[in-house]
Amino acid sequence: MKETIAYLGMGMWGFSLANLLANNGHRVVGWARNPALIEQLSVQRRHPAAPHISIPQNLSFTYHMEEALDGATMIVEGVTSAGMRPVLTQLKALTELRVPLVITSKGIEQNTGLLLSEIALEIFGRPAAQHLGYLSGPSIASEVLRGCPCSVVISAYNPDTLKQIHRAFLTPTFRVYPNSDLKGVALGGALKNVIAIACGISDGFRFGDNAKSGLVTRGLHEIRKFATIMGCRPDTLNGLAGLGDLCTTCFSAFSRNTLFGKLLAEGLTPEQAKTKIGMVVEGVYTALSAHQIATHHRIDMPITTSVYRVLYENLDIQEGIAQLLQRDTKEEYL
């Protein structure tokens, strides 16, 4: 069965998935708030961040959300974590949620500490859980656009919703694996961005592959410990939503979070680094939320804490590195 899909958010990530869904035979209407972007997509049939990609005819665009929702059998969002609440609030004003809503963004809301899925449930109410889905995993947008092989996970509370979303996204090169642990899938995608900043700092100081692999491994341990205390399944974090996404983000040349960390190591301030990158660096905001939650629940997360202190307490990076290296080496999995 082919879907009529409203895709909310036409940044590089949103466009890559909207393009994939259209190439998979679905009718897709992409929405964004920026009229200039929508006009360029509609008239030139090219995305400014990916001008080499031809847009299929069954992918159209609008900056009127109600037009995107007209006849939609599925809604997919691809906005930033900061944009999640206002976009879903606008969506709630236009429709009750009676079709699947697929979250594809990764992050934790500032101030509230809510996962993006929890924001959706707060806005639409607990009964909307039956329509909620979450897609995550190692999926660099530029590679998805090129049709490179990619494996992700999709999670949902309702088995029928899970099957519908799985069917819509699955292609010969975009491998979609079901996972029933929605919260674990969401947390893995959010927390890995903080570890990626630490890996970028390591890259900036040319500490080498041994140090970076150590950060990834110990970072995964932090993520798994955090998620388990939050009620998630540990094995979820050993899979695509945890280890897989963490590896891609920490080692990819296209990772904003890793580049951000590298720029910090080169002497830029956090604000200067964000300005130079010119796009949202989700790990900056997740570091604050994760630190607050970890502190409240007394979860020991030394790498995450160090990144937080560099970003929000002006901790000297060299001092932060020294503190990490001076920690006691306890039993590995304690």
From Swiss-Prot:
Binding locations of NADPH: 13, 33, 106, 141, 256, 280, 282
Subcellular location: Cytoplasm
GO BP annotations listed: carbohydrate metabolic process; glycerol-3-phosphate biosynthetic process; glycerol-3-phosphate catabolic process; glycerophospholipid metabolic process; phospholipid biosynthetic process
Record's keyword annotation contains Secreted: no
Gene3D superfamilies found in the cross-reference section: N-(1-d-carboxylethyl)-l-norvaline Dehydrogenase, domain 2, NAD(P)-binding Rossmann-like Domain
Transmembrane segments: none
Highest taxon above the source species: Bacteria
Keywords: Cytoplasm, Lipid biosynthesis, Lipid metabolism, NAD, NADP, Nucleotide-binding, Oxidoreductase, Phospholipid biosynthesis, Phospholipid metabolism
One Pfam family it belongs to: NAD_Gly3P_dh_C
Stated role: Catalyzes the reduction of the glycolytic intermediate dihydroxyacetone phosphate (DHAP) to sn-glycerol 3-phosphate (G3P), the key precursor for phospholipid synthesis.
Family the entry assigns: Belongs to the NAD-dependent glycerol-3-phosphate dehydrogenase family.
Protein name: Glycerol-3-phosphate dehydrogenase [NAD(P)+]
Organism lineage string: Bacteria, Pseudomonadati, Chlamydiota, Chlamydiia, Chlamydiales
Gene name linked to the record: gpsA
